[in-house]
């Protein structure tokens, strides 16, 4: 038996089945008339909608078709414009990178062919402790592999260390590290290079003149690389620094170890750039998240990026572009979260004195960046091809052309995928294939020529 009790009823009041049913509140039951009225209302609304849809004039339909066609035309025009820009700037960037890479290789090959100091083997790097002066081919191959493992391990450790410093905003330490490296290259290595060139060509020069030349060369380079100056001057100094580093590698790297290191470094570059947790990829992503440029001592840029890396302009300057410049710089200063960030902003170059239009800024931003490590290993391959006893101009030119072809393909892939790509694998692979095939198949015999 089911009982139902209302609050108004007494607890002692008995109830039977009839009184329980009478006191219970039942929901109202919809009647037939209500359902009929609701259905008529829905039919009337549907009929009005159909009349409204059928009453549209042909002009409205034509206008909608015309607007759709205009949208399609604009989309196709934008796609065509994007393709034209890709072709235009793709070809432009190929030339902008071919020139510095070729200049670096020319400096290295010219030095190797003329200065005997860089082809004499009188020592090895501390990173390649195993000697290759053994009669056994197997032992020599093993030593070259061991040297490669040590060299690649050092590169990996130093790269990870740099990424950790950058991630935790240790900008002062990185600046000091790069300044010290640039100082050694621009002063010490340049002094050695100049001395050997003067000795080779039997040019006498007193020490005060040499010191004055080295001081001017190094001081201007330090100012331009780590502070401000013309873009072309920075590019020239970066090419010279790369060439000096290449000559050191060519002199002190054993022959077999150099070839194995070139193959291994291309594989490491592929992993470091494309893997999600690769150190070079993490470095680039961190720089993009913070909207900061990577240090100029590590990167060769084919164009100046005005919107990144500029200090506060003169407040007395007028004009709309100058005011926009101040607003952008103020936002960057407010977005900095540490004292190290302000140090980065303070070392930036000043704003240009002439007003910069939006077209000029977009034109300048379309630049390609190539790591100096890529410059160095490109030229190491060509320099080693020129420095080997069996190396002639055929193998040297073949290696250089192969590197440029690989660089062109890399830039093509860069335009397709529109993300950071490793620059070493394709070029180094082509260079090694062209070098060894040319050295073994296209070698010229002097006796046959004389006959």
From Swiss-Prot:
GO MF, any single term: aspartic endopeptidase activity, intramembrane cleaving
EC number: 3.4.23.-
Stretches the record annotates as Disordered: 1-77, 319-354
GO BP, sorted A to Z: amyloid-beta formation; calcium ion homeostasis; intracellular signal transduction; membrane protein ectodomain proteolysis; Notch signaling pathway; protein processing
Intramembrane residues: 422-442
Family annotation (InterPro entries): Pept_A22A_PS2, Peptidase_A22A, Preselin/SPP, Presenilin_C
Annotated localization: Endoplasmic reticulum membrane; Golgi apparatus membrane
Membrane topology classification: Multi-pass membrane protein
Location of the active site: 269, 374
Pfam assignment, any one: Presenilin
Short sequence motif named PAL, residue ranges: 422-424
Keyword DNA repair in annotation: no
SMART domains: PSN
Membrane-crossing segments per the record: 94-114, 145-165, 173-193, 203-223, 230-250, 256-276, 367-387, 397-417
Lumenal side: 115-144, 194-202, 251-255, 388-396
Composition-biased stretches (Polar residues): 335-346
Gene Ontology CC: one annotated term: endoplasmic reticulum membrane
Cytoplasmic topological segments: 1-93, 166-172, 224-229, 277-366, 418-421, 443-451
Uppermost EC category: hydrolase
Keywords per UniProt: Endoplasmic reticulum, Golgi apparatus, Hydrolase, Membrane, Notch signaling pathway, Protease, Transmembrane, Transmembrane helix
Protein family membership: Belongs to the peptidase A22A family.
Record note on quaternary structure: Homodimer. Component of the gamma-secretase complex, a complex composed of a presenilin homodimer (PSEN1 or PSEN2), nicastrin (NCSTN), APH1 (APH1A or APH1B) and PEN2. Such minimal complex is sufficient for secretase activity, although other components may exist.
Domains (record comment): The PAL motif is required for normal active site conformation.
Its biological purpose: Probable catalytic subunit of the gamma-secretase complex, an endoprotease complex that catalyzes the intramembrane cleavage of integral membrane proteins such as Notch receptors and APP (amyloid-beta precursor protein). Requires the other members of the gamma-secretase complex to have a protease activity. May play a role in intracellular signaling and gene expression or in linking chromatin to the nuclear membrane. May function in the cytoplasmic partitioning of proteins.
Protein name: Presenilin-2
Organism whose genome encodes this protein: Gallus gallus (Chicken)
